Design a protein with these regions (language model features):
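Flexible internal linker/loop segments at domain or repeat junctions
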Residues: 343-367, 398-413
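Signature for the C-terminal beta-barrel architecture of outer-membrane proteins
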Residues: 134-142, 161-338, 380-385, 393-395, ...
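Conserved C-terminal beta-signal and adjacent last beta-strands/turns
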Residues: 127, 375, 388-389, 418-431, ...
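Predominantly the C-terminal beta-signal and adjacent terminal strand-loop region
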Residues: 431-473
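Outer-membrane beta-barrel signature, preferentially recognizing the C-terminal barrel domain
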Residues: 215-221, 352-376, 380
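Surface-exposed loop and membrane-interface regions of Gram-negative outer-membrane beta-barrel proteins
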Residues: 59-79, 87-144, 157-160, 206-210, ...
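Small/polar (Gly/Ser/Thr/Ala-rich) solvent-exposed segments
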Residues: 147
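N-terminal periplasmic/intermembrane-space "pro-region" immediately following the signal or transit peptide
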Residues: 1-77, 84-90, 323-326, 337, ...
């Protein structure tokens, strides 16, 4: 019979348990949804009903994109409303529907605000979810979802449901999710990603209502397996296929780069914990065929060979404010001229705000033609608020390709590879815990030689950007 623990050992174990439970203890979504609408409807049995409303104001000065193609200075007042209803939550089959309403006002006619910000009144989710129980073994749980749905997988760098952006990726198809008794996870999916509509200037300015389109001309499929408890964290292996083709030549046709890609990758990650190191290492390769442009006359298939690497190491101090300092490195391949290959990395349907700064009217940095280390400092003083600041210098991986998401390019390569410095900060504060949260941030882009001297670089100064939004959960 084992000896009973001493008083000192018991105290030490209790302290360790409290420390483990104290991280993370800030969340940008309600820990307990207020269910205001559900309660107002009389709390109907077997239903789940919730929603959110997020107004945002943002502005950009000294545009980094080509001018006058895009406005040199711009503002956007956007609204994102969601309404989620699910029936059958106590049974083996659940029916779910979620409406998205993403609108924008007061932007310039040549604003960079596009379908990433505006998509009025869209049934983003409409699905059946089947509980398949312990199909994968004793102690496991699994489910099959069919219809329209949103999806987060792994790091969210390739497949995601956006959190900051004003519109949300959605897919039509099916997905199977499994979790074993040992906490291993498996996901497989075949989907048709939605093309958001309208996508013309007048339709966007009018917040026109037009249902999004899915078709066999754009398909995403693949699987991910995550091993639990590997080196104190998780290890994920995955592979995704993307098939894309033009949808004809008529008035409503969509011309594409005819991407036929296979994207395998791996990720080793450990979540932040107080008084410990954490890490996130991910390596992705991309192969297949694609065309250089979406022009209908471009019929030349290029061999794709692209890659992306992310490395991150952080440490959280055992202090009341839970300060975390982390070092990051991102390397995404860019394309070269006239080599018969296409080597620019494609992040598929991944999110980027959590790593590279605000998107919306801003968002110069993405996983394409990028070399960028970064340092980040975060604090989490309480469950009510958190904040961070980050510094990131920016280089091009290829001097002849477009830099990240800026649309700035020098095919000659004479503008160099240094794009500039980015400094950003963010503050989040629960005005009413679990019901209303404030989120505000600033970003400063000090332009380097490339963003100043490239042939289509705008004659503007350094870029300033700011936003303020509140989200009400009901």
């Amino acid at each position: 019979m084992p000896a009973a623990p001493t008083e000192k050992e018991t105290a030490r174990a209790s302290a360790a348990k409290a420390k483990a439970q104290s991280w993370p203890y800030f969340a940008a979504a309600p820990a307990q949804p207020p269910n205001v609408l559900y309660k107002a409807l009389g709390e109907p049995e077997n239903w789940r009903i919730s929603g959110s409303f997020r107004p945002r104001v943002e502005g950009i000065a000294n545009q980094f994109r080509p001018v006058p193609t895009f406005a040199a200075n711009d503002i956007l007042n956007s609204y994102l409303t969601t309404l989620y209803v699910e029936y059958g939550i106590k049974g083996p089959v659940r029916l779910g529907v979620e409406l998205f309403d993403s609108r924008g006002y007061f932007q310039q006619r040549n604003s960079s605000a596009f379908t990433t910000e505006i998509n009025a009144l869209e049934p983003g989710q409409a699905y059946l979810n089947f509980d398949t129980g312990d199909l994968g073994g004793d102690g496991s749980k699994s489910s099959l979802t069919v219809g329209r749905f949103t999806k987060n997988i792994g790091s969210r760098r390739l497949v995601s449901r956006q959190q900051f952006r004003n519109t949300i990726n959605a897919y039509t198809g099916l997905t199977y999710d499994w979790q074993g008794a040992n906490r291993d996870k498996f996901t497989a999916l075949w989907v048709m990603p939605h093309t958001r509509l309208p996508d013309d200037v007048n339709g966007l300015l009018d917040n026109g209502i037009e249902f999004d389109r899915e078709s066999l001309n754009l398909q995403l499929f693949g699987a991910s397996y995550t091993f639990a408890d590997i080196l104190g964290g998780t290890f994920e292996l995955y592979g995704y296929g993307l098939y894309e083709q033009d949808s004809g030549t008529g008035l409503r046709s969509v011309q594409t780069r005819d991407r036929r890609l296979f994207t395998p990758g791996m990720r080793l990650a450990r979540r932040p914990q107080v008084g410990a190191f954490d890490y996130d290492f991910e390596a992705i390769y991309q192969t297949g065929l694609a065309r250089e442009t979406a022009a209908a006359t471009d019929l030349r298939d290029l061999t794709v060979s692209a890659y992306f690497v992310h490395a991150e190491v952080g440490y959280t101090l055992d202090h009341a404010w839970k300060p975390r300092l982390s070092l990051h490195y991102d390397h995404a391949s860019g394309d070269r001229n006239n080599d018969g290959k296409f080597t620019r990395f494609d992040t598929l349907f991944g999110a980027r705000r959590f790593e590279y700064g605000p998107t919306g009217l801003y968002g110069p940095v993405q996983r394409a033609n990028l070399i960028s280390p970064s340092i980040r400092a975060e604090i989490t003083p309480s469950k009510v608020w958190d904040a961070f600041v980050a510094y990131r210098p920016l280089w091009l991986e290829s001097a002849t390709d477009t830099f990240a998401a800026t649309l700035i390019r020098d095919r000659s390569g004479r503008s160099g590879t240094f794009a500039g410095h980015q400094i950003e900060g963010r503050l989040r504060y629960w005005i009413i815990p679990n019901e209303m949260i404030l989120d505000t941030g600033l970003a400063y882009l000090a332009k380097g030689d490339f963003l100043r001297n490239a042939p289509n670089a705008p004659d503007t100064g350094d870029t300033f950007y700011g936003y303020l939004n509140t989200t009400l959960f009901f």
